[in-house]
């Protein structure tokens, strides 16, 4: 089986016919099942075979695929009872919205006899709003609590008022968390009720604090950094923490909205290049205020600039400014979150950034393509050379030349390119490192796909083997 290294790639080939895919599926190879489940489309015969496959792992891959048709995923509910849990959990890809299941599937899942299935369904990020809104009046408190957490913004004032006065304390707390920023009384109640909860710090940071409560929290010395981040914490009390021994507390004080640049500079704060900081809430809440964003983008304070960088409303002049910021995280956040991030910023971070997130920048719509062949075809860095095939003006001759590059990543990029001559695609199937990429090429003749399977010893008779 000298070419078995290339066989997996056929599972991702958009031109592979059902017969080829069914032969692959019969191998009971989990990686092949994964690649099949993530195809943009599946022939009906292959979809049916995966739905009814005796191996639970194959069905699970289908249930967890963000690319699989929601109707197809929902039909797993007609199979073994154990599949309901993976259907309920569903796909949860990073920063991607997954199309929801059909309503009938949610009805079955939310009325399932197993509590774990109901729980996973309620907490699945893909459950649509219209399914969750009616739960605000559900007889079972956990359902009302979920409605508070997930769709508060979609509830009417009357429904919200009812939830704020709900007989169940967990429901009341979930509702109160949404109004505490403007309600001192509910903030005080939450501080008492959640004193030993992980949500205590959230209340300290976001709740509306009366003077007496603020002074008590300061005196207790608990959660001082979240307390200092709360804009409702009186400025005169916050100033007492400016010289605190804990650097996290000093940093929180230095990033408060009422401070001038001079007042920030007077505090001994530090933000390291690897420090992970959440977006300052007061900046995010003011993201439609151009002047606030401009003040943050031009601040000497790193945290303010990082917070401005994630705001899509950041004005164009500030985008240009932060694209050249000396803090790597500022540039990366801008590249990740701003719809008008400069193409050259995306390219520079992709080639020179060390954070794992830079690899995802290449899929951004504004990632450059034109001119990359002339710039990088002969670059010493293989990551740069691989970009040359993104250039729409790259010639078939150049793509073929890159398909013979000593670097595996460059050869793989060329192997997937539609301009690569079919003759060379077939040759690359024998490449132990780039053969799998070549097998994904849509111009690969079906006869070559079949021949590859034959050489690899993949049985021609399709059968499910448990």
Where would I find each of the regions flagged by the language model?
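Alpha-helical scaffold segments
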Residues: 1-466
């Amino acid at each position: 089986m000298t070419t078995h290294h290339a066989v997996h790639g056929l599972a991702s080939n958009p031109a592979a016919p059902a017969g080829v895919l069914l032969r692959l599926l019969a191998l009971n190879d989990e990686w092949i099942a994964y690649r099949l489940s993530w195809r943009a489309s599946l022939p009906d015969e292959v979809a049916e075979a995966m739905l009814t496959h005796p191996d639970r792992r194959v069905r699970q891959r289908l249930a967890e695929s963000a690319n699989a048709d929601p109707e197809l995923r929902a039909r797993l509910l007609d199979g073994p009872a154990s599949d309901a849990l993976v259907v309920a959990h569903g796909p949860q890809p990073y920063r991607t919205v997954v199309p929801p299941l059909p309503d009938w599937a949610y009805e079955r899942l939310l009325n399932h006899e197993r509590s774990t299935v109901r729980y996973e369904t309620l907490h699945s990020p893909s459950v649509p709003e219209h399914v969750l809104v009616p739960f605000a009046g559900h007889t079972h408190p956990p359902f009302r609590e979920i409605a508070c957490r997930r769709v508060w913004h979609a509830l009417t004032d009357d429904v919200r008022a009812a939830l704020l006065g709900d007989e169940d304390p967990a429901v009341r707390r979930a509702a109160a968390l949404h109004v505490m920023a403007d309600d001192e009384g509910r903030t005080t109640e939450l501080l008492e009720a959640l004193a030993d909860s992980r949500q205590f710090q959230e209340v300290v940071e976001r709740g509306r604090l009366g003077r007496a409560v603020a002074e008590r929290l300061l005196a207790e010395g608990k959660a001082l950094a979240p307390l200092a981040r709360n804009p409702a914490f009186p400025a005169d009390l916050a100033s007492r923490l400016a010289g605190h021994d804990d650097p996290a507390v000093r940093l929180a004080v230095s990033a408060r909205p009422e401070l001038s640049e001079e007042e920030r500079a007077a505090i001994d704060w530090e933000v390291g290049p690897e420090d992970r900081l959440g977006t300052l809430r007061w900046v995010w809440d003011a993201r439609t205020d151009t002047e606030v964003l401009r003040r943050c983008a031009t601040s000497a304070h790193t945290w303010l600039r990082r917070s401005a960088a994630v705001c899509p409303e950041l004005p164009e002049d500030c985008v240009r400014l932060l694209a050249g910021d000396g803090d790597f995280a500022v540039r990366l956040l801008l590249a990740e979150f701003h719809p008008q991030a400069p193409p050259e910023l995306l390219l520079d971070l992709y080639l020179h950034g060390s954070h794992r997130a830079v690899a995802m920048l290449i899929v951004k719509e504004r990632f450059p393509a034109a001119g990359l062949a002339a710039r990088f075809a002969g670059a010493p860095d293989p990551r740069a050379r691989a970009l040359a095939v993104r250039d729409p003006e790259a010639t078939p001759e150049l793509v073929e030349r890159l398909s013979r590059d000593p670097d595996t990543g460059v050869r793989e990029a060329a192997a997937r390119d539609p301009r690569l001559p079919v003759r060379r695609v077939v040759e690359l199937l024998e490449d132990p490192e780039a053969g799998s990429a070549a097998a994904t090429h849509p111009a690969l003749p079906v006869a070559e796909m079949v021949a590859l399977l034959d050489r690899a010893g993949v049985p021609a008779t399709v059968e499910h083997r448990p």
